[in-house]
Amino acid sequence: MQPALAPAPHPSMQTSAQDHADQVLHDQLLAAHQHLSHPQQPRPQAPATQPPHMQPNTASPRDQNNIDPAISGSAILGAPPQTPPQPEPAPQESPKTYGKRPLSTSKRAAQNRAAQRAFRQRKESYIRKLEEQVKHQEAITEEYKALHAENYQLREYIINLQTRLLDSQGEVPELPGNIDLNQPRADLTLSAPELQRGNAASAGPAPAGPGPQQSQPNQNQGVGPNDDMNSLNRIAVAGLGMRKHPNEDANYLGNNFQARRPRTDDNQTGATETTKQEPDGLPVVS
């Protein structure tokens, strides 16, 4: 047995339901457009009452059951769901500049070029300073090398001088140990009058004898004080000569002593020159 079909709805009921769905959709679109265009204005309230031709007809439950499900479904689906209003996004804030205006690209590029120019200038000045220091160090090195070479030359010269000095000092004979040139001899400090009195006293008691024998002691007695004075003079001259001429030998000093002639007084006019040897090794000419 086939189910009985529902009776077809009345045409007036179909048109009224479609008009109601269109009105609801139109109100929703208008409200959304007003909300987006004027967010601060309050949303207009829907009218409390609708015109009689817009109001849906109230039908009995029997009539509602007889509505075509296709029409009722399209009316329900045609109305979009109402979404809650979304808050409007706040405008983006500009970056914080802390009281300074943001620099443009051209100004920043100019500042970069100026900084690069200053850096190049500092680099060039530092390089020039380093080059000057290198030149100064090279000059000091050359001067040090010259002083080093001169030092070696002076050392060789000093060694040569020391060698020659040692060779020259080896030729000078050493003084005897009993002679001190810095202090005079004590036995030769007697004055000339004392020597004359001593000679006169020794000549008084001489015995008489032949002429040649008497003349010889008188000559020896007269030569005695002169020999002492001459020996003293020769010792002094020898000391001065050794200090002034360290490179000369004893022969030179002997020749100088032989060139000096002894002093003679009235009693020694006819005396002959005699040579005798002193204890100190120096030749004596009388």
Swiss-Prot record:
Residues annotated as region Disordered?
A: 1-120, 197-286
Q: List the disulfide bonds.
A: none
Indicate, by first and last residue, each region the UniProt record lists as having compositional bias (Polar residues). Answer: 55-67
Query: Where are the residues of the annotated region Leucine-zipper?
Result: 130-161
Q: Where is the composition biased (Low complexity)?
A: 26-40, 108-118, 198-222
Cellular compartments annotated: Nucleus
The record's InterPro entries line, in alphabetical order, gives:
AP-1-like, bZIP, bZIP_sf
Q: Domain bZIP, which positions?
A: 102-165
Mainly resides where? Answer: nucleus
Can you supply one Gene Ontology CC term for this chain's record?
RNA polymerase II transcription regulator complex
- Gene Ontology molecular-function annotations: DNA-binding transcription activator activity, RNA polymerase II-specific; transcription cis-regulatory region binding
Q: Which PROSITE patterns match?
A: BZIP_BASIC
Segments of this protein annotated with the region Basic motif: 103-126
Instruction: List where Pro residues composition bias occurs.
Output: 1-10, 41-54, 81-92
Q: From what superkingdom does this record's organism come?
A: Eukaryota
**UniProt keyword Cell cycle present:** no
Q: Which UniProt keywords apply?
A: DNA-binding, Nucleus, Transcription, Transcription regulation
Per the similarity annotation, which family is this?
A: Belongs to the bZIP family.
Check the record and name the PANTHER family matching this protein. Answer: TRANSCRIPTION FACTOR KAPC-RELATED (PTHR40621:SF11)
Tell me, what does this protein do in biology? Answer: Putative transcription factor.
What name is this protein filed under? Putative transcription factor kapC
Species the sequence originates in: Aspergillus terreus (strain NIH 2624 / FGSC A1156)
Record gene name: kapC
